[in-house]
A protein has these predicted regions:
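Positively charged
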Residues: 2-201
Length: 201
């Protein structure tokens, strides 16, 4: 049994659909500015807010994918670890964070999986929503980048996400997410498209 077959079996056993193979074309590496942000960060990142015009310009910009090679890099690992420390820091106490919120316009989110045992935080590179249900509901949302504000937002109650598998980023996988965790994903993936929850009011 070859390595790719084992990967497919593992993904299926985890309830994940292996969707396709992503060739590494050598594109999608971190820029020198992004590397500087990652390497200069202390224990946590500064979170950008809409109150600052320069921050807001970054928050409103669309994000791009990373190459499989970059997802395996030390810089990517450091970025993910610092994103996780940032979102879980007592000063933030969030349930999700997107890379644009710390100044890096790449399609990376960290989300707390309330739908999994132990409610772990997990990182999803090159993530996007490929399907959303017509079943909608309003729920309260806040945002680390929109301080001191909460609003009711209409969201789909079930979605399918597609992302690069961390251990084997050349593979795209799909996962069905429901309930509150689906809302978190929608909120964070909006950030990757330059959209804030206040735009949906």
């Amino acid at each position: 049994m070859n390595r790719n077959t084992l990967l497919v079996i593992l993904a299926i056993s985890l309830g994940i659909i292996v969707w396709g193979y992503i060739p590494d074309r050598g594109e999608g590496g971190f820029t020198s500015h992004e590397k500087e942000l990652i390497r200069d960060a202390d224990s946590i990142f500064r979170v950008l807010t809409v109150e600052d015009s320069l921050d807001n310009a970054v928050l409103r910009a669309p994000s791009t994918d990373l190459s499989p090679k970059t997802i395996k890099s030390r810089d990517f690992i450091d970025l993910c670890n610092t994103m996780l420390r940032t979102v879980t820091h007592p000063s933030q106490d969030g349930v999700g964070i997107a890379a644009p919120q710390i100044g890096i316009n790449r399609r990376i989110v960290a989300v707390q999986r309330f739908d999994k045992p132990g409610e772990p935080f997990e990182v999803y590179p090159n993530v996007r929503i490929v399907w959303a249900s017509d079943s909608l509901a309003y729920g309260p949302e806040g945002c680390l980048s929109v301080p001191d504000r909460r609003e009711e937002v209409l969201r789909s109650q079930e979605i399918v996400i597609e992302y690069a598998l961390l251990q084997h980023p050349q593979w795209a996988v799909r996962d069905t997410v429901k309930g509150f965790t689906a809302v978190i994903f929608q909120h964070e993936i909006d950030h990757l498209d330059g959209v804030l929850y206040i735009d949906r009011l």
